[in-house]
Amino acid sequence: ENGISPRAVWQFRSMIQCTIPNSKPYLEFNDYGCYCGLGGSGTPVDELDACCQVHDNCYTQAKELSSCRFLVDNPYTESYKFSCSGTEVTCSDKNNACEAFICNCDRNAAICFSKAPYNPENKNLDSKRKCA
């Protein structure tokens, strides 16, 4: 437990379930490749892993926004409003500047995940060897 609010991670999870119905985001996307899950280093191993790298970088940018200063270094703690229609995610225009930015980070990642092939061999990768 490193300060990540279950509610905000749960929102990202719901978003992924919107763009990829019947997916199990925690099981499938956590600890995948070099960037999916906590932390990240090296070169992404595939398209899905690259989605996670972009998402990590997006969160890094969020932390630098003046509107996100109160986040205490963790965008996962910010909850935002969004809706799902079919497989289409829409971030609410009621979000403040920081929420809107993080919502878009998550939305873009969820869309990216839905277009990327899933390679089971990249799940639980030996990141010390493969992501140096």
Swiss-Prot record:
Ca(2+) binds at residues 35, 37, 39, 56. It is an enzyme of class 3 (hydrolase). It catalyses: a 1,2-diacyl-sn-glycero-3-phosphocholine + H2O = a 1-acyl-sn-glycero-3-phosphocholine + a fatty acid + H(+); 1,2-ditetradecanoyl-sn-glycero-3-phosphocholine + H2O = 1-tetradecanoyl-sn-glycero-3-phosphocholine + tetradecanoate + H(+); 1,2-dihexadecanoyl-sn-glycero-3-phosphocholine + H2O = 1-hexadecanoyl-sn-glycero-3-phosphocholine + hexadecanoate + H(+); 1-hexadecanoyl-2-(9Z-octadecenoyl)-sn-glycero-3-phosphocholine + H2O = 1-hexadecanoyl-sn-glycero-3-phosphocholine + (9Z)-octadecenoate + H(+). Its main location: secreted. Its cofactor is Ca(2+). Pfam families: Phospholip_A2_1 (PF00068). The keyword Metal-binding applies. The keyword Phosphoprotein does not apply. The active site is at residues 55, 106. Residues 1-7 form a propeptide. Disulfide bonds join 18-84, 34-131, 36-52, 51-112, 58-105, 68-98, 91-103. Activated by trypsin cleavage in the duodenum. Can also be activated by thrombin or autocatalytically. It comes from the Eukaryota. InterPro entries: PLipase_A2, PLipase_A2_Asp_AS, PLipase_A2_dom, PLipase_A2_dom_sf, PLipase_A2_His_AS. GO terms for cellular component: extracellular region. One of its GO terms (biological process) is positive regulation of podocyte apoptotic process. Keywords: Autocatalytic cleavage, Calcium, Disulfide bond, Hydrolase, Lipid metabolism, Metal-binding, Phospholipid metabolism, Secreted, Zymogen. Its EC number is 3.1.1.4. Binds 1 Ca(2+) ion per subunit. One of its GO terms (molecular function) is phospholipid binding. Secretory calcium-dependent phospholipase A2 that primarily targets dietary phospholipids in the intestinal tract. Hydrolyzes the ester bond of the fatty acyl group attached at sn-2 position of phospholipids (phospholipase A2 activity) with preference for phosphatidylethanolamines and phosphatidylglycerols over phosphatidylcholines. May play a role in the biosynthesis of N-acyl ethanolamines that regulate energy metabolism and inflammation in the intestinal tract. Monomer or homodimer. This is Phospholipase A2. It comes from Equus caballus. The gene is PLA2G1B.
